[in-house]
Design a protein with these regions (language model features):
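Conserved, charged catalytic cores of large soluble enzymes
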Residues: 32-33, 37
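Solvent-exposed adhesion/ligand-recognition segments of exported proteins
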Residues: 25, 30-31
């Protein structure tokens, strides 16, 4: 019996262009860089001062207490639309994020250290695909977890005090990169 091997060709479309972002409770959109982080987008759009200059960081502790929305629109070429399988791949969503494709929630992420691969063929259209990532504040998610415990976990590297959370060391609840201070 003779076996033949089919060579499958993977086609990749990077979605790094055309992103915008906003504070979830506000309506003003600003240009965003993806991949990136909200702090650099805020700085690039002159919404905040340089956090590394003098004591500016102290006045920027509100950022991680807010929810943020990132959005882009993309089109697929006709040959891509003929593909049987399509996946959307995220490498490092920080951290609590809901991902929507054309108003369908396709992912609820909770771990910055993993790659997320989501089958999306059923949600994709050739034009005007709207991809939205809603980033939840880790403070809003994790403070209730801390409050619910009758004891405290050790977290000597936690920066909660600097962020105005006093002794609520919430970093132990999130699969998220820590501050490098």
């Amino acid at each position: 019996m003779k076996h033949t091997r089919m060579k499958l060709k993977t086609v990749v479309k990077n979605l790094h262009e055309g992103w915008k972002f906003r504070q979830a409770r506000l309506t003003n959109w600003y240009p965003a860089t993806v991949p990136g982080v909200v702090h650099t987008d805020l700085l690039q759009n002159k919404i905040i001062e340089d956090p590394f200059f003098r004591l500016n960081e102290r006045g920027l502790q509100w950022i991680d207490k807010e929810d943020w929305v990132y959005e882009t629109c993309f089109t697929l070429a006709a040959d891509m639309m003929r593909k049987e399988n399509m996946e959307l791949v995220f490498e490092g969503l920080d951290t609590y994020a809901d991902v929507y494709l054309n108003d369908e929630c396709i992912l609820k992420a909770d771990n910055m250290f993993r790659c997320w691969s989501i089958p999306v063929r059923q949600y994709i259209r050739e034009e005007n695909n709207i991809l939205k990532v809603y980033f939840h504040s880790p403070v809003k998610i994790d403070v209730p977890k801390w409050d619910a415990l009758p004891y405290q976990y050790p977290a000597s590297n936690d920066q909660s005090e600097n962020g105005g959370l006093f002794n609520k060391k919430i970093s132990i609840f999130a699969r998220k990169a820590g501050d490098r201070k």
